[in-house]
């Protein structure tokens, strides 16, 4: 069938428009259309390409949306080695670097370009006639993995440049702080291993063979290097940064041209103070000789260029002693080693415990009980042991043995597959797994049974009263009274009332509480909107699940594996028999007053929890996001607001108090309470 010419032209036009709007949004940070208008353009393109698949090209913007499951990453040789950088934390050493450069070049002063050192993953991107054809990881510096398909999901990487040049560039892929925190929060809810920092999260994301994982994690990029710059008439690094932005790449806006080393040091000191204001982690400043002809004269060693150096920020670091290393067992059986420390003050908080992530990490760092260690707060958030002070060992230190059995149930331990870094308890009846599963099930984001705390859960499981999560709905006053001291009649009555109330929990929260790996609240909402009942979800196939926007192959397999388990089906049957709400009717939106509006919330609200205000906004046709951007319409501000307020003010986003929001939507809080909606 011959394709009409006007269809071909429309598809080309749509691609050009979408790439132009990507450029304005990601590179210029100045969008001129709404998210809804952008989505309409993308949807039209997807539908046309679905109808005329022969017109689909590898560089079409639609390829960012589709999903692929790769067999493996092929290894490709870099056209030019990706070298590492020498680094220093010391002002005297940066002056020594400048002195050495000036001496070799026989110059009194040298122009430098200073760029923020992003805590991410280095990549090489190749374009032919302006079209993205290959993306490589750094690998060993000589060869890297072909991660082209994954990099296509990073929206700020252009698939078509604004000029038809053939060029290779290099840059950093990173995960914004809010996305990193969201991802770790999601993983915490489903008992997944947490990422230590955004760099690890980025690296782990880019290594995924299932491209849907990348699409569901918001990665970003900054490009900073052009291979063979003389081909494009570029004489300096400063010129190169301007040219990169001009042809469509996202370039860090905080780079600075410095006339001498004093200005470099001033820049470094300025960003030591200001780095916490950024929406991504940085760990220093990269200092580069500006002129390319000077770079050529200086050359490189086999490991690093002589014309550049990383000027690292001083870490928030403290010295302490490892008192003990204990092993915790999570809901899915993951064994996590935790260091108990002599308490230290670090970045305004007392640190007593630090996760050691896994046993490979302990072996790599050679951490022993009794060691003196340095603990840092990466990005000012997560404390971790970064190094051991081996010189201070006295011989009394003890190596921890990798467990050969579960510390709780003495069951077998092992790894699920060769790529699994986590050691797990393989006993399906391990009481530690059940305890953690119950904690997830009754947590605030799920059934929200406040009376079921950690200590009571321990007693219920240890006594044998609770053998699975559904058993809590069959507890009797007499059984609870037999648990011993501290369990009075009033407490029993309150607990049973809360358990009864929990039967009315919305389906998406029940799904969240089940703890299916990688299924957090967002995914649970998607599943609820699609299937509306547990029974329909139970009968869904992997293929059916992967057709749903936001559900990739890994999540789909986890869902299927979870519900295929006979024990799970028994639990679902018990929950249904107990009277839980396992079916959700179609939501009836009374008003569309917030249609097409996007909100964010910061601070503590007096009338609503975060979940309740989110539910209210959604019921009125609006959306609630976890972060503030130019596409956010309003930020609802409560008591003790966080960084979202500052960002909203900087972006000019409208602010509403809680009362102003209620007036805006014409809702009386008293009526809401009378209707028991909140």
From Swiss-Prot:
GO CC annotations on file: cytosol
Reaction(s) catalysed by this chain's protein: NAD(+) + (deoxyribonucleotide)n-3'-hydroxyl + 5'-phospho-(deoxyribonucleotide)m = (deoxyribonucleotide)n+m + AMP + beta-nicotinamide D-nucleotide
Keyword Ligase: yes
Residues given in the record as Zn(2+) binding sites: 406, 409, 425, 430
InterPro entries xrefs: BRCT_dom, BRCT_dom_sf, DisA/LigA_HHH, DNA_ligase, DNA_ligase_AS, DNA_ligase_CS, DNAligase_adenylation, DNAligase_N
Keywords: DNA damage, DNA repair, DNA replication, Ligase, Magnesium, Manganese, Metal-binding, NAD, Zinc
Active site: 117
BRCT domain ranges (all copies): 589-678
MF GO annotations: DNA binding; DNA ligase (NAD+) activity; metal ion binding
Listed transmembrane segments: none
Alphabetical list of SUPFAM superfamilies matching this protein: BRCT domain, DNA ligase/mRNA capping enzyme, catalytic domain, Nucleic acid-binding proteins, RuvA domain 2-like
Biological process terms in GO annotation: DNA repair; DNA replication
Cited function: DNA ligase that catalyzes the formation of phosphodiester linkages between 5'-phosphoryl and 3'-hydroxyl groups in double-stranded DNA using NAD as a coenzyme and as the energy source for the reaction. It is essential for DNA replication and repair of damaged DNA.
Family statement: Belongs to the NAD-dependent DNA ligase family. LigA subfamily.
Name of the molecule in the record: DNA ligase
Organism: Pseudothermotoga lettingae (strain ATCC BAA-301 / DSM 14385 / NBRC 107922 / TMO)
């Amino acid at each position: 069938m011959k394709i009409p010419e006007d269809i071909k032209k429309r598809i080309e036009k749509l691609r050009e428009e979408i790439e132009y709007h990507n450029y304005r949004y990601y590179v210029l940070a100045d969008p001129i259309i709404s998210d809804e208008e952008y989505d309409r353009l993308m949807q039209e393109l997807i539908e046309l390409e679905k109808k005329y698949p022969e017109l689909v090209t590898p560089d079409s913007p639609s390829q960012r949306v589709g999903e692929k499951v790769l067999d493996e990453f092929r290894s490709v040789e870099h056209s030019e080695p990706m070298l590492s950088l020498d680094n220093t934390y010391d002002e005297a050493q940066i002056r020594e670097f400048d002195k050495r450069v000036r001496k070799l070049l026989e110059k009194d002063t040298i122009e430098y370009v200073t760029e923020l050192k992003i805590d991410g993953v280095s990549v090489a991107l190749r374009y032919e006639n302006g079209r993205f054809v290959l993306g490589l990881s750094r690998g060993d510096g000589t060869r890297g993995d072909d991660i082209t398909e994954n990099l296509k999901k990073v929206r700020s990487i252009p698939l078509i440049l604004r000029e038809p040049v053939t060029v290779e560039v290099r840059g950093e892929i990173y995960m914004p702080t809010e996305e990193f925190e969201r991802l770790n929060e999601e993983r915490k809810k489903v008992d997944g291993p947490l990422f230590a920092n955004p760099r690890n999260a980025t690296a782990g994301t880019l290594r995924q063979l299932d491209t849907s994982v990348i699409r569901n994690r918001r990665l970003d990029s900054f490009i900073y290097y052009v291979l063979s710059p003389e081909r494009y008439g570029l004489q300096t690094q400063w010129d190169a940064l301007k040219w990169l932005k001009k042809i469509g790449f996202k370039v860090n806006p905080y780079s600075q041209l410095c006339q001498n080393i004093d200005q470099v040091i001033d820049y470094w000191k300025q960003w030591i103070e200001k780095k916490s204001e950024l929406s991504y982690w940085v760990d220093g400043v990269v200092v580069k000789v500006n002129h390319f002809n000077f770079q050529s004269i200086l050359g490189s060693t086999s490991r690093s260029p002589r014309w550049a150096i990383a000027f690292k920020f001083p870490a928030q670091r403290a010295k302490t002693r490892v008192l003990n290393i204990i092993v915790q067992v999570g809901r899915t059986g993951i064994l996590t080693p935790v260091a108990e420390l002599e308490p230290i003050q670090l970045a305004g908080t007392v640190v007593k415990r630090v996760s050691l992530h896994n046993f490979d990490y302990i072996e790599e760092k050679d951490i022993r009980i009794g060691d003196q260690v340095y603990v840092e707060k990466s990005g000012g958030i997560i404390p971790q042991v970064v190094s051991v002070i081996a010189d201070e060992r006295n011989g009394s230190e003890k190596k921890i043995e990798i467990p050969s059995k579960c510390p709780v149930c003495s069951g077998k331990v092992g790894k699920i597959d060769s790529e699994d870094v986590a050691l797990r308890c393989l006993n399906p009846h391990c009481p530690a797994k059940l305890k953690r599963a119950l904690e997830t099930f009754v947590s605030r984001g799920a059934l929200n049974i406040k009376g079921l705390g950690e200590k009571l859960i321990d007693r219920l499981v240890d006594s044998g009263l609770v053998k699975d999560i559904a058993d809590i709905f069959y507890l009797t006053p007499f059984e609870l009274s037999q648990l011993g001291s501290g369990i009075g009649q009033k407490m029993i009555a309150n607990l049973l009332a809360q358990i009864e109330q929990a039967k009315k929990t919305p389906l998406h929260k029940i799904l969240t509480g089940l703890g299916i790996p990688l299924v957090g609240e967002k995914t649970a909402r998607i599943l609820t909107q699609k299937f509306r009942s547990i029974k329909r979800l139970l009968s869904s196939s992997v293929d059916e699940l992967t057709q749903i926007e936001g559900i990739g192959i890994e999540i789909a397999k986890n869902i299927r594996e979870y519900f295929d388990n006979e024990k799970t089906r028994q639990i679902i049957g018990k929950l249904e028999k107990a009277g839980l709400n396992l079916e959700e009717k179609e939501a009836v939106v009374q008003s569309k007053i917030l249609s097409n509006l996007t909100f964010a919330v910061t601070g503590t609200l007096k009338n609503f929890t975060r979940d309740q205000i989110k539910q209210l906004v959604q019921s009125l046709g609006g959306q609630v996001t976890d972060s503030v951007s130019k596409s956010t319409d309003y930020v609802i501000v409560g008591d003790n607001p966080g960084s979202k307020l500052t960002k909203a003010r900087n972006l000019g986003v409208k602010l509403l108090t809680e009362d102003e929001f209620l007036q805006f939507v014409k809702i009386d809080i008293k009526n809401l309470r009378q209707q028991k909606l909140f």
